[in-house]
């Protein structure tokens, strides 16, 4: 069930003059060869900003995919948005596994709670280092994705091997 790196989605579906499109997108999906060893990594999930339907379903699907399809056994939920990374807020993380998210798709809101507003990017990356997080999934809207981008820039600046992934949600 792996997707080959050779699989592409053409930018232009139809060409009238018979020319081949030069532009294509990489097809999404699981790859046979991946950068991280899933059995050795710790993943993190955070939800930020306003709530919208389906957030718990996204959390559940992430946990199930990471656990069952990739073999990731250490998944942390960071509570109350980006505040969850800042020690002075004293928010505890939540261990996520298939049992803990089994029925969350039937519950409204976010099991991780949420918050709005920026936090210190340096402190967030410090927390990722302390907790040995190698993949961080940020679920949120424009502000969250801007924050995820800033986190990724700081990770790159420090030359860390942490993947920052943005999952858009909005109403």
Spell out what each predicted region is:
Residues 46-47, 77-79, 113, 138-140, ...:
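Short beta-strand segments
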Residues 152-171:
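Short, acidic/small-residue loops that bind anionic groups at enzyme active sites
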């Amino acid at each position: 069930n792996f997707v080959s790196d050779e699989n592409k989605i053409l930018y232009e579906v139809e060409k009238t003059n018979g020319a081949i499109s030069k532009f294509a997108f990489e097809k999404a999906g699981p790859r046979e060869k991946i950068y991280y060893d899933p059995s050795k990594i710790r993943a993190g999930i955070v939800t930020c900003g306003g709530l919208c339907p389906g957030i718990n379903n996204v959390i559940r699907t992430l946990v199930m995919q990471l656990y069952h399809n990739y073999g990731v056994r250490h998944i942390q939920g960071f509570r109350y948005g980006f505040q969850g990374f800042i020690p002075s807020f004293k928010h505890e993380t939540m261990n996520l596994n298939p049992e803990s998210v089994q029925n969350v798709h039937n519950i409204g809101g976010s099991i991780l709670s949420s918050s709005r507003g920026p936090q210190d990017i340096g402190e967030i990356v410090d927390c990722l280092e302390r907790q040995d997080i190698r993949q961080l999934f940020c679920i949120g809207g424009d502000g969250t994705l801007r924050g995820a981008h800033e986190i990724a820039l700081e990770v790159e600046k420090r030359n860390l091997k942490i993947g920052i992934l943005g999952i858009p949600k909005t109403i």
